[in-house]
Amino acid sequence: MRHTGSWKLWTWVTTFLLPACTCLTVRDKPETTCPTLRTERYQDDRNKSELSGFDLGESFALRHAFCEGDKTCFKLGSVLLIRDTVKIFPKGLPEEYAIAVMFRVRRSTKKERWFLWKILNQQNMAQISVVIDGTKKVVEFMFRGAEGDLLNYVFKNRELRPLFDRQWHKLGIGVQSRVLSLYMDCNLIASRHTEEKNSVDFQGRTIIAARASDGKPVDIELHQLRIYCNANFLAEESCCNLSPTKCPEQDDFGSTTSSWGTSNTGKMSSYLPGKQELKDTCQCIPNKEEAGLPGTLRSIGHKGDKGEPGEHGLDGTPGLPGQKGEQGLEGIKGEIGEKGEPGAKGDSGLDGLNGQDGLKGDSGPQGPPGPKGDKGDMGPPGPPALTGSIGIQGPQGPPGKEGQRGRRGKTGPPGNPGPPGPPGPPGLQGLQQPFGGYFNKGTGEHGASGPKGEKGDTGLPGFPGSVGPKGHKGEPGEPLTKGEKGDRGEPGLLGPQGIKGEPGDPGPPGLLGSPGLKGQQGPAGSMGPRGPPGDVGLPGEHGIPGKQGVKGEKGDPGGRLGPPGLPGLKGDAGPPGISLPGKPGLDGNPGSPGPRGPKGERGLPGLHGSPGDTGPPGVGIPGRTGSQGPAGEPGIQGPRGLPGLPGTPGMPGNDGAPGKDGKPGLPGPPGDPIALPLLGDIGALLKNFCGNCQANVPGLKSIKGDDGSTGEPGKYDPAARKGDVGPRGPPGFPGREGPKGSKGERGYPGIHGEKGDEGLQGIPGLSGAPGPTGPPGLTGRTGHPGPTGAKGDKGSEGPPGKPGPPGPPGVPLNEGNGMSSLYKIQGGVNVPGYPGPPGPPGPKGDPGPVGEPGAMGLPGLEGFPGVKGDRGPAGPPGIAGISGKPGAPGPPGVPGEQGERGPIGDTGFPGPEGPSGKPGINGKDGLPGAQGIMGKPGDRGPKGERGDQGIPGDRGPQGERGKPGLTGMKGAIGPVGPAGSKGSTGPPGHQGPPGNPGIPGTPADAVSFEEIKHYINQEVLRIFEERMAVFLSQLKLPAAMLSAQAHGRPGPPGKDGLPGPPGDPGPQGYRGQKGERGEPGIGLPGSPGLPGSSAVGLPGSPGAPGPQGPPGPSGRCNPEDCLYPAPPPHQQAGGK
């Protein structure tokens, strides 16, 4: 018994105390920096009950939601997950720790780059970060070294690829003093030795689960995210909660093993005496009572009390890699994520596959015949064509021209058969053969031709004959004149299929056939050399908007906005402009009398007449003085009146309603060139520049505003004087689009652009007109027999031939001879049966009807090539043969007309990312887009250069007549003061009575406003086209500029921006031309006025500012005044 007790004590000590004492060396120190983690969720591993660390999901107060069965996930939301670091790690991080996360990616994020965890310092510079890159299938760990530089360690292993398969996975990173260890699904993937780390500033902020492009939460399903203060924890963690397939059923060993042994998942199995090897690295502990102490080996002990939890054991050696888990269940479709920010331009992708052939367009108009090309080289032999079905018999061609007399040929084959003999006995019935079968050569010798027999009954089909041997080429005949064209022979019988001939020369191009079936996708061709840039083409028409495409994957962050371009050089001064007549100036001081000169031109306006009677006072409350209206047109010049007496100065009346705008002035001299902004879309530039020139929609007519209230009368200020000319005001809001202007003259040609890339192969064009007959070609090889021709006309009666000797009895025709391959069987015609015995020659009878086809003759000798005949009409298309191998690409055909737009196809799967395309040709202005969302006001831009003098606007409607002002008090006549210095020009006095008619002046030159209008249009178009040509030549890569700003299609045009800052005052206009002579005034001559005083009246006081006018219509911004807010530069975390 004493030995038994000692053995029990030794067993207890070696089983429990020894591992417990050893484990004390690897425990963390939670009392220093790490709190104890909560334990209610860790029933799969008992030792986790005393783990210390940080649960980032709880620290960020993330909400829970069910994501698969009873598995819960954190809802990441749509706001950046960022907290103060000191709140997450109040006492900092230990030097060694472990990061453990369990998640699965979604379809939209399996190719995204995102931060799992990131600590920033107070300057928002990254100190520690863990990056998961779905595009490169890598995991990156970054920290700052002891010298402050960023150190980035990239783990790129084949074992990491399943991390992005949209299944649940555990990822762990063990951070030790000089070692980084990466675990996935409880397996060690790789370890890296690192340099010494720098201390971490915990006064900054911490970010989790954020996209690298815009910082928004990444679209993943996150189950847990913890940081353990024990760097060796990952080697002990189990993956039982990943999938049921990770947990094998418990065997008998599980019920007898101690809690310490099972909790370590077999990693410390060598410490257990007599313990068998575990079959799997994952042993899941059932949630039930724990096993007690083991009993003695030779006696069954009583159940012991529940043991105390054991300490952490020593780190076991890494186990063998587990088997690959089964594919997880399909995840529930997640919510649609928010639209991501534009990423940076990605690397050039591989060449995309060739697109499918488009639908056939309508036939284009036949182009003009091109010039005759040089004779091409002999093409390579084409692939052997399969025998197609017999085509439908074509129509008989027109008789050819009479050829030249040929040379004398060699002795021909035997002549036509003699006169008909008596009918022979019926032949034996031949075997039924399919149409076009093969014939074997007969065994009998060829007898002499007998006399022609009478027409026998139609015989049964004979046996097929075999292919005869190829005949030798005969010697060339003696040269003689060409014989006359013979009569058309009778159609021969269908022969057997001949031996495959050598490939013939390429035939003439056939008619355009119907489109073939869609071929298989060919392999992508290699990138050809870059062609020289082409001329700038005409803009293409705006296409119909396509269907909504599949949401693209997020790109890399974009780069910074490029610096604005330098302003263009100042243009040369233009020719002086032509202006409209100005108003007549006031009289100057009287000059000294000169000698009598010749008859002068029209005189200056006369002095103002005496003031009229005071009108009755107006009715109504005095209103504020309105703003100054535009000057009205000069009225008809009345006759000069007599000098009137000086009137009493009255109170200044209210300003009248605004008069109509004057007619458009001629263009002034050109100013500095407009610094056109580098817009990403030329269409938007043109729209802003000329108010949507393409649409040509007349502007809406402005609605006449309500009458303003009557202004208050201004107070009389005798000391007031006319103010100096104020600075040029800011440009008004642009008016609405005016009516369609007259067609301008053709502009100057633009600058020659670079040659464009080689276009796509065009659709084969229609056959061109037949060219002139070329020289006779070389002798061609013998072609295949042509289709059976139509029955010819009856030939003229030939001279009777000599009767041939009687032939020997024939052999039963069960097989044909070998030359039947040269002919085709007519429908319903059969091989003749036995020939009858030769009869005596009968008397010459009348020409009988055309007989059946005669017996097959021997092949004739090869004749000389005949003169090329005229091209016959095209026969009907034959039955389609089997598709041959694809031929070499033909020359591009004449472009056809644009076909009708086909139906919009279904959205296809996104193809692989292709390389950045070359810049396309600028298209035409697109159709006006839908009203965009009101953009945010942009920052105030720098002061622009001085703009050109604007073109005078159209004449506005005539304002209504203002209400009369109150009658002013009559002032007393003051004493005549001394003559002062010449004052500024005073306001015009009251209208005097009409004077006597003046002497008619000489007529002035007429001004044609249509010519002025035409000249304005011509000058505006010329300046616009010159500047557009310079702008387009400088803008060499519009597509590259667009792609640098954003990916994807450009959005609809935004609303008009806020008006820009006022420009500098424009240059003073030129003096107008002399106006036409006015019509004589109408009215009775007035009575002579009283002489006026020589003193000039005091100027009236300036009126008070008028009421605020109604807001004008929303205008379009001038391109040089438009402000385009630059996107803020994206802050990227650096990495090494």
Curated annotation (Swiss-Prot):
Residues 289-348 are annotated as: Triple-helical region 1 (COL1). Residues 47-231 form the Laminin G-like domain. It is found in: Secreted, Extracellular space, Extracellular matrix. Residues 302-314, 332-344, 472-490, 714-725, 737-758, 937-948 have a biased composition (Basic and acidic residues). One of its GO terms (cellular component) is extracellular region. A motif (Cell attachment site) lies at residues 946-948. Its main location: secreted. Transmembrane segments: none annotated. Residues 252-272, 289-673, 699-1005, 1043-1136 are annotated as: Disordered. Keywords: Cell adhesion, Collagen, Developmental protein, Differentiation, Disulfide bond, Extracellular matrix, Glycoprotein, Hydroxylation, Myogenesis, Repeat, Secreted, Signal. It holds the Pfam family Collagen. GO terms for biological process: cell adhesion; cell differentiation; extracellular matrix organization; skeletal muscle tissue development. Oligomer; disulfide-linked. May act as a cross-bridge between fibrils and other extracellular matrix molecules. Involved in skeletal myogenesis in the developing esophagus. May play a role in organization of the pericellular matrix or the sphinteric smooth muscle. The numerous interruptions in the triple helix may make this molecule either elastic or flexible. This is Collagen alpha-1(XIX) chain.
